[in-house]
């Protein structure tokens, strides 16, 4: 799909990200970072500073100079071809200068290609790479480029080559590496640590090679419906998830503005679920392999000296590539519901893919670690016989030290439920599985409530999206037959505009934030209300940006290309076809449609109306 925007569109503009899970940069309509916030300049996955919260090293800004480019830009167009990641742009200056640009990042090689065509602009075109200047970051010129090194959470080093078929004038001065040529039609590449690419490749040939790498991804799933805006957001969300997937896992985004590209198990689950229902199992497996690789670290975090004899596992809230905690100190470090997200994404990989061998060899260890953490360090047995979840940080807007919080309780129930199902299926620790199920029942009975409603927290001091948790994201653990839960959910939905922001100081803006709308839509689909679920996605949520991109909060212009919201949106759309990953649940809300998705029973489902 080719998605275009221009200066006349009255929506928030954010540059388009290009990358491959290692490289990440946003490209604006000038085909550079000339009109881009410095936060969205070039970054690389995993290359981190030694700062307390281990921000990514900012590699540098891509800027340009040519005769007439100081003149005001009076018109512009920009487009993204999601099939191959090509970003095209055209700018018109007040003085008549026109610049056309094509930019792409190879999906499987660390190469960014640029094609520039100038009109009415005599003299040289100069491409400038303004090197990052973070502490302990160093650049020096070498043949055809720059040698770089960073001393951060580890020592990093490499080479950036600047290649072109045009003879170049090269200069490195004041931290800026520049290449210049008089050509009006100019093609060049930035090549990062790719020793086999030592000569100039043809732009269109390399683009075609990259497009071939994209083909399997797009063939694994599709939807087609007569809703242009929904299709646009669905396609750009899938595009961004693909280029946002690192060799480790799925961050919120690969920029320091996006929580430093760290790995929230809470957020990554929403992307993982979308990957599962789309059948993108190679990508999903990277996520759970990352969590499995960190299992021993998580056991040490949970048990300290006893990590070799106890099975409880507690992963960091904002996990770094070395499995350590990357977040700043705050009450968010007291979250515990993310262990359920790790359990669920592991379970979903095994269910949707049908990979039972992984479940037996590795998955069962992850599920056990999560379940044992809740049993031993979260569930409290009260003198009156009730069981509740201990004080912790539930949703951050509730503040610290919330006991028996609804969402966290649902998370523990879900982790225990699926661990028990797995244990019984594999004939493993069946007596412990029975204890898990007894605990699930006891926790359900102790949820904060009165005769009419469940409460997000016992104090019932504010409504919250948390009350949806018994259906989504926690795998319907409260069941569909509970009328009190249904009343509670619809009571929240009637008031969601007031409470539909995860940040208390940014709530009450009139519309539900886009990713909370996805939560609602999924719940409605699972209740069999797919027309209403579609309406929530289409009419009730905050807007998307010019290219259909999702923001964490659109009205506040906070975090464009927000992977968490993208994952939830994709899953919400997929559940309009297969609610809860189940086929045979009635028709989607269109007369004309086609789709290819994966069911939670390991089947590929393809239908055409």
Feature annotation, model-predicted:
Residues 17, 24-27, 284, 316, ...:
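Structural recognition of the beta-strand scaffold that forms the well-ordered cores
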Residues 252-264, 310-365, 369-437:
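The feature captures the catalytic groove of carbohydrate-active enzymes
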Residues 210, 214-229, 248-255, 286-288, ...:
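Short coil/turn segments at secondary-structure boundaries
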């Amino acid at each position: 799909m080719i998605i275009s925007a221009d200066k006349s569109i009255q929506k928030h503009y954010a540059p388009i990200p290009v990358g491959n899970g290692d490289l990440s940069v946003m490209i604006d309509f000038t085909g550079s970072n000339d009109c881009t916030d410095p936060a969205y300049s070039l970054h690389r996955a995993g290359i981190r500073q030694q700062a307390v919260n281990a921000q990514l090293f900012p590699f540098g800004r891509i800027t340009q100079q040519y005769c007439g480019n100081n003149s005001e830009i009076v018109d512009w167009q920009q487009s993204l071809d999601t099939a191959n990641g090509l970003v095209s742009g055209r700018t018109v200056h007040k003085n008549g200068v026109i610049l056309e640009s094509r930019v792409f990042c190879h999906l499987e090689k660390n190469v960014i290609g640029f094609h520039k065509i100038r009109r009415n602009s005599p003299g040289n075109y100069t491409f400038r790479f303004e090197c990052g200047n973070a502490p302990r970051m160093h650049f020096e010129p070498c043949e055809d480029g720059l040698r770089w090194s960073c001393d951060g959470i580890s020592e990093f080093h490499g080479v950036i080559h600047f290649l072109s078929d045009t003879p170049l004038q090269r200069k490195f001065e004041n931290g800026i590496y520049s290449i210049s040529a008089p050509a009006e039609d100019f093609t060049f590449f930035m090549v990062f640590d790719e020793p086999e690419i030592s000569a100039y490749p043809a732009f269109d040939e390399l683009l075609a090679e990259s497009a071939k790498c994209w083909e399997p991804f797009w063939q694994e799933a599709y939807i087609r419906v007569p809703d242009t805006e929904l299709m646009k957001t669905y396609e750009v969300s899938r595009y961004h998830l693909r280029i946002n997937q690192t060799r480790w896992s799925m961050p919120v985004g690969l920029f320091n503005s996006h929580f430093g590209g760290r790995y929230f198990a809470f957020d990554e689950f929403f992307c993982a679920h979308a990957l599962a229902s789309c059948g993108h199992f190679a990508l999903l497996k990277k996520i759970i392999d990352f969590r499995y690789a960190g299992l021993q670290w998580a056991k040490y975090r949970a048990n300290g000296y006893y990590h070799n004899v106890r099975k409880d596992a507690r992963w960091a809230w904002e996990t770094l590539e070395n499995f350590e905690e990357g977040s700043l100190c705050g009450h968010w470090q007291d979250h515990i519901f993310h262990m359920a997200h790790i359990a669920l994404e592991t379970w979903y990989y095994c269910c949707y893919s049908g990979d039972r061998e992984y479940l037996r060899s590795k998955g069962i260890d992850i599920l056990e670690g999560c379940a044992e953490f809740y049993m031993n360090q979260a569930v409290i047995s009260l003198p009156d016989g009730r069981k509740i979840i201990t004080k912790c940080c539930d949703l951050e807007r509730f503040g610290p030290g919330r006991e028996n919080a609804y969402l966290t309780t649902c998370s523990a129930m879900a982790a225990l439920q699926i661990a028990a199902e797995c244990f019984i299926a594999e004939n493993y620790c069946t007596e412990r599985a029975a204890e898990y199920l007894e605990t699930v029942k006891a926790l359900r009975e102790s949820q904060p409530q009165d005769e009419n409603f469940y409460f997000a927290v016992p104090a019932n001091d504010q409504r919250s999206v948390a009350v949806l948790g018994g259906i989504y994201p926690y795998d319907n653990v409260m069941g569909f037959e509970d009328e009190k839960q249904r009343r509670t959910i619809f009571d929240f939905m009637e008031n969601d505009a007031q409470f539909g922001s995860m940040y208390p100081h940014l709530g009450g803006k009139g519309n539900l934030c886009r990713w909370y709308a996805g939560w609602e839509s999924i719940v409605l689909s699972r209740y069999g209300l797919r027309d209403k679920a579609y309406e929530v996605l289409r009419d009730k949520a905050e807007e998307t940006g010019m290219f259909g991109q999702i923001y964490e909060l659109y009205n506040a212009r906070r975090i464009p290309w927000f992977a968490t919201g993208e994952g939830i949106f994709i899953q919400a759309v997929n559940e309009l076809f297969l609610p809860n990953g189940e086929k045979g649940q009635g028709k989607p809300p269109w007369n004309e449609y086609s789709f290819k998705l994966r069911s939670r029973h390991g089947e590929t489902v393809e239908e055409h109306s």
